[in-house]
Amino acid sequence: MIVAVDVGNTSTKIALCENGTVVDKWRISTCGKRTAAEYFSCISVLASRRSADILAGVRGAAISSVVPVVNRHVEELFERFFNISPVFITNSHADLFGLKICLAQPTIGADRVADLVAAKTLWPTSDLLVIDMGTATVFNLLDRNGGLYGQVVAPGVSCLVHSMRECTALLPQTLVRESEKIVCDSTAASLEAGLYWGYRAMVEGITKQIMRESTRTLRVIATGGGVGLFRNCDYLNHIDELLTIKGIVQIYEKTQG
């Protein structure tokens, strides 16, 4: 069994995978002060809900991280409690799958590498627009030959929520929920609707503009923690909340045989 870990700025996704299939998955907050022992305690409690000894079958781990301060704690987690050395995903892993980063600054986050590996594996002959709705919303343009030739980076929905919370004194705290209508008669409902429809309009607007500028016919793939809320966005051809995890597992299997 493989443990795939996706450390994002806001949350950390952990998945147990066997033979390429996700057996179980959890999401915890990302915290730079969480120790290896605390990680192990947390994972043990979550895993025990499925099986008391499920972690005994762990034979490898791969990590995608965009939060460097967390890396040493997660590495210690696997070395100390599982006696394995985890694979940390880097840009060099893109080469193993025939991907080329054709950007002015040819360095991207490990999560984006995993996204592109999985997307290219699933749709090998398509020109792709891969949207990751994380703390930042990243639009990746990948041609059918495996070249990442363009990108757009915009705020994620959690950034919008945080900004409203931090920059306004009287507005209530809220979570983003799917809203059927945009015009509401209460402050709380209006805030929820504004966040939902505002973010959705941003994603649809950027996607529409990318498609307008592109000379290619793009297959649009969406992933990320909040993608389920926005499954009804226009232009999205495929939604896969596990795309990053799939890419992490594929990279592990490629590097470890």
UniProtKB/Swiss-Prot annotation:
GO terms for molecular function: ATP binding; metal ion binding; pantothenate kinase activity. ATP binds at residues 6-13, 135. It is found in: Cytoplasm. One of its GO terms (biological process) is coenzyme A biosynthetic process. Its main location: cytoplasm. The active site is at residue 111. K(+) binds at residue 132. Pfam families: Pan_kinase. Its EC number is 2.7.1.33. Its cofactor is NH4(+); K(+). Homodimer. This is Type III pantothenate kinase.
